Structure formats: C-alpha cells, structure tokens
C-alpha cells in the first residue's frame, strides 16, 4: 500500500503526531494509500521552511531563474500527465477522459507563468506636481498559504502556485484530506524541476 509522507523543506517527513489516515478509491471503496495527518506543529515547520527559503534568496531571485524553473516543471508535467491523470481518477473519482485533458492543460499553466515571471513590472504614474515622481513596484508578498478543495486538486494547485512562484513567493499547500495523494505526488515533480528546498511545502 502506498504511503505518503509530508513534503517539508525539500524532504519527506513523518507527521509530528505519528497519525495517518486512509484514502479510498471512490470507484471501489478500497483503501489504496495512507496519508500523513498533519497538525499545527507540522504547519509551523512548513511555514518556517518557506520563510527561510523566501528570506534565503528565493524572494530576491532573478525572475528569469524563476521562469526557467516553472517552464522546466511544465515539461515534467507534460511527461507525467497520463500518470497524474490516472492518480487523480484513483484519488477523487473523476472520469479518465476528463483528467487526461486536464492534466495536459496543467503544464500550460506553469509554462504561461514561467514566461510571465520576467515581465512583471511597475509603472510610472504621471503627476503635475513639480519635484515629484510617482511609480509602482511589484514585490513578492512572502509565504503564501494555498488551500485546495477535493474536486480538481492539481488544477487548483496550479491556479494558485504558478503565479505565486512566478512573483517570487514561497508556498505552503494544504490539500483536501479527501484528495491529498495527487498533490503529494506532485511534490516529486517540484523536486525534480530543481526548486530550492522550502520554496514549496
């Protein structure tokens, strides 16, 4: 039986509580995996790792670097789309035909924001006041929390994670306890793409 630990600071870890919960295949009702049950202590570790990664260089990293990592992740998603689609079917009961198309689209979302990362810019705001200069400058927020529902885990992670990373934020993802497996499996792709430890937890 598959067992999914938590992904915190670039490493797979057991939950602080030592507790696990079952995930069932909605088609058969059979338990097919055990998922780590996170608690406040685990969340604190994840947020601390994300904060350290943000302050340790990710927040000031070159946008072109962030864009390259996002595009690399998109390529990996394209390669793994069929497997991810089947995993989502097993985890949440969606139709394979729907998931086949949806997982192929997910890579495009990361590719789009990868291309946008080095195009985030401020603007100069005209003023009629002498000796005054108005402008906007966009900066990353820092650590962001991404809570995702059960119905389309990977797609909804993409909607939130891709723009957050492109802008220079770090993230802590809290997937639905009903469909956690695909999000946890996705962390393998994050690691393969080369994101620094703690950027995504």
Which positions does each model-derived feature cover?
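Terminal low-complexity tails and localization/encapsulation signals of metabolic enzymes
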Residues: 1-35, 68, 72, 122-147
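Short glycine- and Lys/Arg-enriched binding-loop motifs that mark or flank ligand-binding interfaces
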Residues: 6, 14, 89, 111, ...
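Histidine- and aromatic-rich ligand-binding microenvironments
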Residues: 7, 22-25, 34-45, 194-201
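Alpha-helix N-cap/helix-start motif
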Residues: 16-17, 43, 81, 99, ...
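Glycine-rich loop-to-alpha-helix module at the N-terminal edge of alpha/beta enzyme cores
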Residues: 30-120
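Rossmann-like NAD(P) dinucleotide-binding subdomain of oxidoreductase/dehydrogenase enzymes
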Residues: 122-201
